[in-house]
A protein has these predicted regions:
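Structured C-terminal helix/loop/strand segments within mature extracytoplasmic catalytic/sensor domains
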Residues: 44, 53-154
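Mid-domain, small-residue-enriched loop/turn segments at the edges of structured enzyme/sensor domains
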Residues: 1-61
Length: 154
C-alpha cells in the first residue's frame, strides 16, 4: 500500500479557486465517460485533491448552489467523529483502476477556531486486501494526531 499524498490546510477562510456549476450542481463540462462508478477517478470528471479541498471549503462555508437546509443535512451526515475538542466531517471513496484499488478519505476537522481540510488518497495493487478500507482513515487520523499534537486522534 502506498500513501500518495495528503493535502491539509490550516485555515478557516475560503481562498480557493472558482468552480463553475450549472443548475444541477455538476461541472458545466460534465463528462461521465469514465463510467458511473469511476468517473471521479478517470474520464472528464476526475477530481484532484486540491479540487476536493476547494469543494469542502465551499460546503463548509455554504457556498454551493444548494439550499442551506440541504447543505446542513449533508454536513450532519458527514460527521465521522464528534468529541469535546473537535468535529471531523468526512467522506470515503473507493474504486479500481488499472489493477489498483484507489481509496479516498476527504473532509475537514473543526477545532475551536481552526479548520483543517484534508484529502487522503491511497493505492494498493493487492486485490481483496482486508486492511485497505480502514487504512484510508487510519493514515489520516495518524497525521491529524501529529498536527494536533495528540497521541490518539482516532
Amino acid at each position: 500500500m502506498q500513501r500518495e499524498e495528503i493535502v491539509a490546510a490550516d485555515r478557516a477562510d475560503n481562498d480557493g479557486g472558482e468552480l463553475v456549476y450549472n443548475d444541477s450542481g455538476a461541472d458545466i463540462d460534465a463528462d461521465t465517460s469514465g463510467g458511473i462508478d469511476r468517473f471521479w477517478l478517470s474520464g472528464g470528471l476526475r477530481i484532484t485533491m486540491e479540487q476536493q479541498i476547494d469543494f469542502l471549503r465551499r460546503l463548509r462555508n455554504n457556498q454551493l448552489p444548494f439550499s442551506r437546509r440541504s447543505v446542513e443535512i449533508v454536513k450532519d451526515i458527514m460527521i465521522a467523529k464528534d468529541t469535546m475538542g473537535y468535529t471531523v466531517r468526512a467522506k470515503t471513496g473507493w474504486g479500481a483502476m488499472s489493477g489498483l484499488d484507489i481509496g479516498w478519505y476527504v473532509g475537514y476537522l473543526e477545532s475551536d477556531s481552526r479548520v483543517y481540510y484534508f484529502a487522503n488518497c491511497i493505492q494498493s495493487a493487492k486485490p481483496d486486501n482486508p486492511h485497505f478500507a480502514p487504512a484510508r482513515i487510519d493514515i489520516l487520523y495518524s497525521i491529524l494526531g501529529e498536527v494536533l499534537g495528540k497521541k490518539d486522534s482516532n
